[in-house]
Amino acid sequence: MEEDLFSLAAGKQPSQQATNETAPRAGEARENAGTDHPGNAEDPAHRRIDYLRSELRRHNRLYYEQAEPEISDAEYDALFLELEKLEKAHPELSDPDSPTRRVGGAPLQGFNQIRHAVPMLSIDDIFEQRDAPVPDEELAEFYHKLSRALQTENVPVSVEPKIDGVALSIMYRNGKLAYAATRGDGDVGDDVTANVRTIRSVPLTLPPGAPPVLEVRGEVFMPNEAFAKLNEERDADGLPAFANPRNATAGTLKQLDPRQVAARPLAFLAHGLGAYEGPELRDAKDFWNMLRHCGIPCNEPVYYTDSLESTRQAVRDIDRLRHTLPYGTDGAVIKISSTATREALGATARAPRWAAAYKFPPEQKETTLLNIVVQVGRTGVLTPVAELQPVLLSGSTVARATLHNQDEIDRKDVRIGDTVLVEKAGEIIPAVLKVNLSKRPQDARPYSILEATKGLCPACGNPIMKEEGKVAWRCTNFTCPAQAVTGITHFCSRSALDVESIGSSVAEALRSSGLASSALDLFSLMPDQLANLNLGTPEEPRRYGEKNARKALDALQNARGLPLERWLIAFGIPLVGEVVAKALADTHPDLKHVADSPYLRDIVRLDELVEQAAKTNPNTRENKKAVKEGALSAEAVQERHQELMEEIDRLTAPYLATGYLRKNTAKFSYGSEIGVAAAKSLRSFFASAAGNHTMDVLHRLGINPQSQSYRASLLEIPAGSLSGKTFVITGTLSHPRDYFEQLIASHGGKATGAISKSTSCLLAGNGGGSKRDKALKLGVPVISEEDFYKMIGN
């Protein structure tokens, strides 16, 4: 990088086009995770580099696209730094798609995409290493690099707090907010204009004299006090707290319903500039003055320095001040002040050369883990939370830390009574890093969620379950009070009962007002109750209104007559999605028959019999050894195995005859989409207290959803024109995505979310670049909407 800086300072600037051409497109890094590199794949450094790239890509996807990070910033930074050092030491393993060359994640499919007028780059990090022998070593190295490039000892820079939020670009044209977009992959981001318009600190119009084109870069965040209040409310409602304000902000900003965004206290602060047409801005001071004139909220305080020592002092001042700021910050951003010098130094494909983010080391302290409590989230997931001896950490007293799940508890071997090291790196609920085993009490026992809860949900007392291959325990109760908001929202969703005017904000108001503690309570609502529902606050009330109330009640009345599969989806039973619900409707005339289904019973029983028969097979090594040693009788083993095989034959005969069960050597496969796991989940639900309560309530309401596709003969479903074909849908089409998914299913095909070699076709509208690129790379045909209609004979 030094050579680039010297050549740039001498006037050799790369064109903007060249910079853009080196920047990877959305999704490329993940798709190229297995790209071959020169060098020996058995070399330890090569293997470690491949591993780090793969892990960083995965964490980028979790952070930027799903807003569900698994690791802290400090852990991510450690992986990133290790990869950078290895790549510098092994230039022969260079890869233009490495995470060290990328900005962030791909745009979400739920939003339209916007191409940034000027690439929205990230900023390179420099670190203060904990207990480093030379303080601020990387800061000094960065400053000296700028000095050498500019051939001057003193470089004027600005220093400001690094906001721990979500990057956002807001475009103003002729004084009006034109659009707002997330960073995305740096070139293309998600259009979140409707959501950003609900943020009160963002001006929708600028005063006279504002630049005709002004693209402001900044951070959306949730103020600390508002975030603490939000978590207090969730705690009072028995909901798990958000891990940190950034997670809450990212999840809120990516809601598809702006009303949900408006209900959350988001704020915005500007710190940078994208496209610009207006009076010349000579330096950072001009930039900040222009923003203030326009009424755009600015990141403060800003320090102006012109030496290494004064820059160090500014960083120390921000470190002291950061716990008093109204938002989370984990560092200080250092930028060259002069606009002309910034343009001369330019940028790499990933970040500007004229700026760096100085990261403070996360604070760590030991404390005692007093207890572990299990909370039930709004989706039914059980989360273990450590209750700690209160300790002062990063300017606030903390007394709890999330332990995430049972696997995390087992991996760290966390036990009640342990002395644990906790870290707060931008986390409101700190992370438990590790256990100090030297201080472990002798009577400390391994912790089990299943044992601690006795297998029952702490919120409702119904059974909990863990799906195969998943890490989370989950409450299966459709009417669990802890899941009220999510349950009602899902119940009313388009794929379920399609009660359009009841979303999550209305569901939250219904729950908090006591009008509905579960989805089935909706059928007992009176028009005046719903019309007078307050969607605002006590200080600023906002009525739901008669029009919305009538609309919702009409939709609920219409829902009574919706087909069986829609109701099965509405219940939110684990593993029962649209495909399984349709198969259940094909094989059962109504809901009562599903609740007491011989078919589901037989699927579960067959699985048990096959497992028992495998254990009693006289030809297994274990049984032969037991017979030889006299522990088992050969005749008894053979007799029991024969009994089981005969019962299997009796059970499967009618299903084999109709084609709903097929046998390949000793294995069975199902002619419908109802597999063993889904059958077990359904049986568990209808046998539970929650399932019985659901059926009782529906009986009182006179509701017994009917199938519109029931085949009494249990014959094989006729193959359609798309039978055996798998489709992926991308881009903007003439109808919503679920319209095409239903068309595909009705013609015997299947719609999935991810491209693979087994995908038959990619149905592509406008946009959808990354999936289109991957389809072409894998040789998957890309078809238009017109091509698709021809395939189904329309």
UniProtKB/Swiss-Prot annotation:
GO annotation, biological process: DNA repair; DNA replication
Coiled coil location: none
Metal-binding in keyword set: yes
Residue intervals of the BRCT domain: 717-794
Keyword Magnesium: yes
Residue ranges, compositional bias (Polar residues): 13-22
GO molecular function term, any single one: metal ion binding
Catalytic activity: NAD(+) + (deoxyribonucleotide)n-3'-hydroxyl + 5'-phospho-(deoxyribonucleotide)m = (deoxyribonucleotide)n+m + AMP + beta-nicotinamide D-nucleotide
EC number(s) recorded for this UniProt protein: 6.5.1.2
NCBIfam families with a match to the protein in the record: dnlj, PRK07956.1
HAMAP family according to UniProt: DNA_ligase_A
Biological role: DNA ligase that catalyzes the formation of phosphodiester linkages between 5'-phosphoryl and 3'-hydroxyl groups in double-stranded DNA using NAD as a coenzyme and as the energy source for the reaction. It is essential for DNA replication and repair of damaged DNA.
Name of the protein in question: DNA ligase
